[in-house]
Amino acid sequence: MPGIAGHRDLFFAGGIPVAQRFIKRHNQSIFFMKKFIQKAFGYDPKTSSIKTEILAGLTTFLTMAYILAVNPGIFSALDGMPGGSVFTATALASILGTLVMALWAKKPFALAPGMGLNAFFVFTVCLGMGYSWQFALTAVLIEGLLFIILTLTNIRKIIVDSIPVSIKKAIGCGIGLFIAFIGLNNAGIVVDNPATLVSIGDITTGKALVAFIGLIFTAFLVVKKVPGSLLIGMISTAVLGMFIKDPATGKHITEFSGVVSMPESVAPIFCQFEWSQILSLDMVIVVFTFMFIDMFDTIGTVVGVSTKAGMVDEKGNIPGLNRILLADAIATVGGACFGTSTTTTYVESASGIAQGGRSGLTAFITALCFAVALFFSPIFLAIPGAATAPVLIIVGVFMMTPIKDIDFSNYSEAIPAFITMVAMPLCYSISDGIMLGIISYVLINLLSCNFKKINPAAYILAALFIAKYIFL
């Protein structure tokens, strides 16, 4: 019988091959895991690392998580759409779209219900035109399905080319002005005035004071390029609201009721479509506007971010662009079913790409973060309009960037672009801004004999829009 020393010698003698087998299996597991990640997400170890991709995904989420509070806040203006359900729908649409982008397109772009598009849904289609939110959801669904068809055909290019470049630039700027105006109004910084239409509110007290302080602080974070500045600014403003009361109600601006809870059901808004007016001209105009904004928003974001990050080929083309656009369209269809406005690719994806994200793994991590956020709805839903207002205003500033590309020395381009921009906030309607812009562009250049500048399809659009104003 061997003694203790003998057993010890046998253990260590046999332990070496055991350890070697363990290390070999461990290395094989890592190898197969990396191979799986490469295949599933298009990950290339030559251009990035797994750690970098994970950090990039977290960064992207932090920069766009504000939508989880802002979107339910915007939809709160509508009856019949519970804030908790809209929050869940927002998160689910973001998860679905971002996962499709990660696993199918294999790109580091994240998706969520789009700013501007949610404002158009609520304030133009429902409150402005007087249609139900079910009508608007139906328009979003149709837009998503059409977007899929257009992406699979050459029609998308025809539509894109039919709109003058100056009008394309002006639309983004106009939407920026529109959502900034909504933010200022929600905050009480800009209020109704029977004599002058609008005037400044009392910014020395209540929600206007909280929003103004939040705006300055958030702007400071943006200037300093602090990662997640919009989310940090929004949460900080909400915390400030816990210590300041609203004179109108006597309650604190912010009142938290919890931290963690199960996600609220989307049943009240799930697949609530209205088919009775799908052939009306208003439906056509609403669908066109949704699709137009979604298409150019997505293309502009993807092209701009990809070019800046060097994610293009030697000819300047973006590999897999059609898959990116299809992922966007599929997300819109899914979002409409869940009960929220058009889901689109977020320009905030640039923050994660700037951190080194280059594959679908970045988007996958962002989707996981949205999944976790589902269980923190009490925090996001407690954030008041005074805290989301600074985000709306600053996002409006971001959307004004294309204005520098409009040639204001050429009045045949500048005047229609200007009309497009100012009509959106002043008419409180994104679609009216687009229609007036295209009509004015065609008529001004037609009278100026600039026939070659006008795309044939633009004549058709202008005629349809004029008919809409005359007969409806």
Task: For each feature predicted by the language model, list its residue ranges.
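Helix-loop-helix hairpins and the membrane-proximal interhelical loops
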Residues: 33-85, 199-200, 234-322, 465-467
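N-terminal, intrinsically disordered charge-dense segments
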Residues: 3, 15, 20-21
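Juxtamembrane transmembrane-helix boundary signature
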Residues: 93-115
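Helix-loop-helix junctions within the multi-pass membrane cores of secondary transporters/permeases
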Residues: 34-71, 93, 114-123, 127-175, ...
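Aromatic (phenylalanine/tyrosine) cluster motif
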Residues: 11-12, 22, 31-32
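Loop-to-helix transition at the N-terminal end of transmembrane alpha-helices
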Residues: 80-99
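Intrinsic-disorder-associated, low-complexity terminal segments enriched in Asp/Asn/His/Tyr and depleted
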Residues: 7-9, 26-27
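Membrane-embedded alpha-helical modules
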Residues: 129-243, 364-472
